[in-house]
Swiss-Prot record:
Mod. after translation: Glycosylated.
GO molecular function, one term: serine-type peptidase activity
Signal peptide start-end: 1-22
Tissue: Expressed in retina; at similar levels by both cones and rods. Weakly expressed in brain. In embryos, expression is restricted to the central retina.
Described function: IRBP shuttles 11-cis and all trans retinoids between the retinol isomerase in the pigment epithelium and the visual pigments in the photoreceptor cells of the retina. Also involved in the transport of fatty acids and retinal development.
Name of the protein this chain belongs to: Retinol-binding protein 3
First and last residues of every Sequence repeat: 127-301, 423-598, 721-897, 1022-1198
GO BP of this protein: proteolysis
GO cellular component, one term: extracellular region
Pfam family, one: Peptidase_S41
InterPro entries referenced in this protein's UniProt entry, alphabetically: ClpP/crotonase-like_dom_sf, Tail-specific_protease
Length: 1219
């Protein structure tokens, strides 16, 4: 029994009253029928009627005497199950039913009165239109009162800048009125809603209207819809549509969650009625409905405050344009990255600001876009101006007293100097002064502050309490920590406001003795360290001159400026200065990140600890380099990297190192970067790592043998007699020798008779390399032995050649059957060497991911007496084919694909390769049977078939590659580039020449096509000129002969001489050549133009001039010149050849391309391969004089660019001579 009626009968049971029975079983059945026929969610009522019948027959429903109680019970039951509060059962013996439409029909005057009292409008401050609608009228009423609404209300709202649509009091309306409300605010013909009506079982789609009375408000101006908890029905639907079309911002309360259409329907013949929603809305915009749940506003406020809130939102939105204008101006005039400004100015105004409802939204939107476009964290837009705590104005020189005692006292106050144990200098000052002040105080500073610390070995500069100040003294202070002999570039400042770029260098001369560039300097920082103090710390770090210790600095630079926006609480911080360090890196704000991050209070102790550690760095760097020189497999690389490491130390590159872990990280990075070998690695370990020494392999017992074989090897014979072998570790050669007979019996013998073999190495991470020759030997013949690779061992400085073995257990797979190896990023070490060996020797096709690039042998060595260890590959593998060291980056497969797709690709390639011999046979037969020159075709076919056993075809991986290979071989054998093989995928078969017929234009298009395709002219001396760049089929030509004569031929036929320009003619069908040639001979005298031999029909065809032509002929007497070029091809060459051979035309230009008669295209078996074969040839020429493949030699060979001028010159001379 469905839960609805379980709930209903249970309620009836507990409310049952034995006396005065009111309930009749038919009442429930009648109610069910009403719901089934009218409820707008019929799918929720499946099985209801049958359940009721069973409940009634079973006596589960008792009698209730009170009708109101019974109505409440029914209401509770249907609402509880269907979760629909709109379903209400009532007992109303005096209900007379709804009035008929006729009784509700109103006069025009009554309609206007109704409209005037249900629609109100106003123009609010800020040119905001206000329209309140309490009843959405239907289509019929709109037709009657529409002009009145437009003229008296809408036209007055149209000039407003924004519109508030107030639906807070709209509780009723007609569905047919929804498109009218929405259409005035949106574009035409947009699908806005779908309404299902249950009584008629129909769905009606609502669209915005294509035409309206009056103008549309448009989709640009802002619209705000006001709602309340009383907004109901049709008004809810309109609100929902406008919200989800992003056309309006909904402000107010969540709506009632009513219905588009509810009806109170009588239940049977009783006095009970049920209110049922008979229609439902399903939005095409969201796929959901607002019914029951209501429309949630974009901005939630009390209904009484909604209008004020809407006006506030519109005020903010109206400011967007003003804010954008100000922002663009500020950026254009101030942003330091001037090259990024055009993109910003173009992008920002075109963003979608439809969701902006507050200044916070404007700030968030614009800030996100600014960050995305510029990637500049300094460029920040905020909704409230945060007051930055900036240092006070720096002391200026004019404010400094002249009294020496007071100057000395000032220096003593500002600077704190002491000498710490270990000859460590300590200097603290809490503000940067202007360089003019430093100049005035310099003698006192040098004597009192600087001279005592110049004799120290290391110096701690305490900036933890330094709030910055003027940065003009920073270059001077930096100069004290550099060598004075060299002018060093410190940084570059680009000031956008001043449009200046300053290169700042160290001072060559300073007062007093410089500290120099070799001693240790340690700068202490805190969150308070700001402006000039940050610049100093940043530059000391970027110049590799100091180790920074403490907290990340404040990020309070003087490179940016805050610009407020007029009339708002918004402001934008714009970097007006770009600070570029000596490495060319831009400092994009943010605090300076210390090399050692500790709490400010702990920074001094940490500095002392690092000072004690730093002397040990160079021995460790040198020791690491020495280990490389001794053990790394490639000596020349080892010496280079060792030198780089030591040079970096001498240049201060290790000052950022603060402990052994950071030293290990930096050494690893430097070694890998400079060697290109990712296997070099330095690491820190408190305890000495266990170094596994080579142990003699344990030979498994017979009991262990089966387990090992099952664990390491997985085999299967796949459909098509394809073997599959997976093994996940390379075992030692001694184990292989010991278990060889069992391995052959249990594994190998099941695979050796397969036609091809897939070896799955995707999960093989390596193992012992000693077994590689054994495994490889199974895939080569016993003789000759194959040189697989050479292993060079640095520890012994010897190379060992690795060869296949003359004898193996069991039968070999041989050297001819295909092998496919599947790889992944996990494939490593010995598995890589096995894989690469077979790839180098073209013995296998590799499919999958590039392998990991793990070394065959890696030694681990301790660096001095420290806790640092370095792993160094001490063997390299040298290719037997190229003689070069194998790359350390791993093996790249022939077919790179994700590892999980490798098996599918392997099957696809296997299937293709099984077809290759048949494809070759088919292609050869097509050439032999159809090639225009029979002897050549037979010779090419014979040689082509012999190529099938070549390695090139055995390594084909795709039909594309096969097509390219066949094409190259056929053209190489035939010396005919018109004999082609192409790959044409399924989705491109509409482009197959000679297979898919060309689309013939409609007759209506022919006239324009002819005018476009033919170019005619008449030069001086009555010389005609005609050019066309392609020959048409004779059938097509016959269809348009009248048009050709009218629009082309008549313009040149009566001239005294004619130039036919074939320089750009690429050929086409040859069937129209007799027609064209006939116009240049005399009528009534047939002329044999050519003999054409067709190989497909093995017949010779004589080509004659035609007796009947449309229009008059040019005749055989008037001079005719044909222009040619190296582009002239195919049918154009045949025409030129005929006219020259018969002496009818004089040919001027270049030798033609040497094409052929139009070839035929043949499909090769069930592949996507097609052969294009020349099947016809001209047979009139003497042997060896045909134009096919050689071209037509002109009578006058000159450049095609000058051919026309030369032709005109020749014809003018001839015509002049005749006169």
């Amino acid at each position: 029994m469905p839960p609805l009626f379980q709930a209903l009968t249970t309620a009836l049971f507990f409310c049952g009253i034995a006396s005065n029975p009111l309930f009749q079983p038919s009442l429930v059945m009648d109610m069910a029928k009403v719901l089934l026929d009218n409820y707008c969610f019929p799918e929720n009522l499946v099985g209801m009627q049958e359940t009721i019948e069973q409940a009634v027959k079973g006596g589960e429903i008792l009698h209730i005497s009170d009708p109101d109680t019974l109505a409440n019970v029914f209401t509770s039951g249907v609402q509880g199950y269907l979760n629909d509060p709109r379903l209400v059962v009532s007992y109303e013996p005096n209900y007379s039913g709804p009035q008929t439409e006729q009784s509700l029909e109103l006069t025009p005057e009554q309609l206007k009165f109704l409209i005037n009292h249900s629609v109100k409008y106003d123009i609010l401050p800020g040119n905001i239109g206000y329209l309140r609608i309490d009843f959405i009228i239907g289509q019929d009423v709109v037709q009657k009162v529409g002009p009145h609404l437009v003229n008296n209300i809408w036209k007055k709202l149209m000039p407003t800048s924004a519109l508030i649509l107030d639906l807070r009091y709209s509780t009723q309306g007609e569905v047919s009125g929804i498109p009218f409300v929405v259409s005035y605010l949106c574009d035409s013909e947009i699908h806005i809603d779908s309404i299902y009506n249950r009584p008629s079982n129909t769905t009606t789609d609502l669209w915005t209207l294509p035409e309206l009375m009056g103008e549309r408000y448009g989709k640009v101006k802002d619209v705000v819809v006001l709602t309340s908890k009383y907004t109901k029905g049709v008004a809810e639907d309109a609100s929902y549509i406008l919200k989800h079309m992003n056309r309006a911002i909904v402000v107010g309360e969540k709506t009632a969650g009513g219905s588009l259409d509810t009806q109170k329907i009588k239940i049977g013949q009783s006095d009970f009625y049920i209110t049922v929603p008979v229609s439902r809305s399903l939005s095409p915009l969201t796929g959901q409905s607002w019914e029951v749940s209501g429309v949630s506003p974009c901005v939630v406020v009390n209904a009484k405050d909604a209008l004020d809130k809407a006006q506030a939102i519109l005020a903010v939105r109206s400011s967007v344009t003003h804010v954008l204008h100000q922002l663009c101006d500020i950026l254009a005039n101030n942003y330091a990255f001037s090259e990024r400004i055009p993109t910003l100015l173009q992008h920002l105004p075109n963003l979608d600001y439809s969701t902006v409802i507050s200044e916070e939204d404007i700030a968030a939107k614009l800030n996100y876009e600014l960050q995305s476009l510029t990637e500049d964290p300094r460029l920040v837009l905020k909704s409230k101006t945060d007051t930055l705590v900036m240092p006070g104005d720096s002391i200026q020189a004019e404010n400094i007293p002249e009294d020496e005692a007071m100057l000395q006292a000032l220096v003593n106050t500002v600077f704190k100097v002491s000498i710490l144990p270990g000859n460590i200098g300590y200097l603290r000052f809490d503000q940067f002064a202007d360089v003019s002040v430093i100049a005035k105080l310099a003698p006192f500073i040098v004597n009192t502050v600087w001279e005592p610390i110049t004799i120290t070995e290391n110096l701690i500069i305490d900036l933890r309490y330094n709030v910055g100040g003027s940065s003009t003294a920073v270059p001077l202070l930096l100069s004290y920590f550099l060598d004075p002999e060299t002018k060093i570039h410190l940084f570059t400042l680009h000031n956008r406001q001043q449009n200046s770029t300053d290169e700042v260098y160290s001072h060559p001369k300073v007062l007093g003795k410089p500290y120099g560039s070799k001693k240790g300097v340690y700068v202490l920082t805190s969150h308070q360290t700001a402006t000039a103090a940050e610049e100093f710390a940043y530059l000391m770090q970027s110049l590799s001159r100091a180790t920074i210790i403490g907290e990340i600095t404040s990020g309070n630079l003087m490179h940016s400026k805050v610009f407020p926006f007029d009339g708002t609480q918004l402001s934008v911080t714009v970097p007006i200065i770009n600070f570029i360090d000596s490495n060319g890196d831009y400092w994009l704000g943010g605090g300076v990140v210390p090399d050692a991050i500790v709490l400010a209070d702990e920074a001094l102790d940490k500095a002392k600890e690092i000072i004690a550690f730093h002397p040990s760095i160079f021995p460790l760097v040198k020791g690491t380099g020495h280990l490389l020189e001794v053990h790394y497999a490639i000596p020349e690389v080892a010496y280079k990297v060792s030198s780089v490491l030591q040079n970096k130390w001498s240049e201060g590159g290790y000052r950022s190192v603060v402990d052994l872990e950071s030293l290990a990280s930096l050494l690893t990075s430097e070694m890998q970067e400079n060697s290109g070998d990712h296997r070099l690695h330095v690491f820190y370990s408190d305890t000495e790592p266990e170094i596994l020494e080579d142990q003699p392999p344990k030979i498994p017992s017979p009991e262990e043998l089966n387990y090992i074989i099952d664990a390491l090897f997985k085999i299967e014979v796949l459909p098509g007699n394809v073997g599959y072998l997976r093994f996940d570790m390379m075992a030692d050669t001694e184990i292989i020798k010991a278990i060889g007979p069992q391995l052959v019996s249990l594994v190998w013998n099941k695979l050796v008779e397969t036609n091809s073999l897939i070896i799955d190495m995707r999960y093989n991470t390596g193992g012992y390399s000693t077994a590689i020759p054994i495994f490889c030997s199974y895939f080569f013949d016993p003789e000759p032995l194959q040189h697989l690779y050479t292993v060079y061992d640095r520890s012994t400085s010897t190379g060992k050649d690795i060869w296949t073995l003359p004898e193996v257990f069991g039968e070999r797979y041989g050297s001819t059957k295909d092998i496919y190896i599947l790889t992944s990023h996990m494939t490593g070490s010995a598995a890589e060497v096995f894989t690469r060996s077979l790839k180098d020797l073209n013995r296998a096709t590799l499919i999958g991911e590039p392998t990991s690039g793990v070394s065959l042998s890696v030694g681990m060595y301790k660096v001095g007496d420290s806790n640092l260890y370095v792993t160094i590959p001490n063997q390299v593998v040298i290719s037997s084919v190229t003689g070069k060291v194998w790359s350390v980056s791993g093996v790249e497969p022939h077919v790179i694909i994700q590892a999980n797709e490798a098996m599918n690709i392997a099957h696809r390639i296997i299937k293709l390769r099984t077809k290759i011999p048949t494809v070759i046979q088919t292609a050869a037969k097509l050439v032999a049977d159809n090639y225009a020159f029979a002897d050549t075709g037979a010779n090419v076919a014979s040689k082509f078939i012999a190529l099938v056993d070549k390695i090139d075809y055995k390594m084909i991986k795709s039909e594309v590659e096969l097509a390219e290979k066949i094409n190259d071989d056929l053209q190489s054998l035939s010396k005919d580039f018109h004999l082609k093989a192409v790959y044409i995928p399924e989705n491109s078969k509409d482009r197959i020449p000679g297979v898919v017929p060309m689309q013939i234009p409609s007759p209506e298009l022919f006239e324009e096509l002819i005018k476009f395709s033919f170019h005619t002219d008449v030069f001086e001396k009555n010389i005609g000129y005609i050019r066309f760049d392609m020959f048409a089929d004779s059938d097509l030509l016959n269809q348009v002969s009248d048009l050709l004569v009218e629009h082309v031929w008549k313009k040149v036929v009566d001239q005294d001489a004619l130039i036919i320009d074939m320089r750009f003619n690429i050929g086409g069908p040859t069937s129209s050549i007799p027609i064209f040639c006939s116009y240049f001979f005399d009528e009534g005298t047939p002329v044999l133009l050519d003999k054409i031999y067709s190989r497909t029909s093995n017949a010779m065809t004589d080509i004659w001039t035609l007796p009947d032509l449309v229009g008059k002929t040019f005749g055989s007497k008037k001079p005719l010149i044909i222009l040619t070029s190296s582009l002239t091809e195919g049918a154009a060459e045949e025409f030129v050849y005929i006219m020259k051979r018969l002496g009818r035309a004089y040919v001027v230009g270049e030798v033609t391309s040497g094409g052929c008669h139009p070839p035929q295209t043949y499909h090769v078996d069930d592949t996507h391969l097609y052969l294009t074969i020349p099947t016809s040839r001209s047979a009139s020429a003497e042997p060896g004089e045909s134009w096919e493949g050689k071209g037509v030699l002109p009578d006058l060979e000159i450049s095609s660019e000058t051919a026309l001028l030369k032709a005109k010159e020749i014809l003018e001379s001839q015509l002049e001579g005749r006169r």
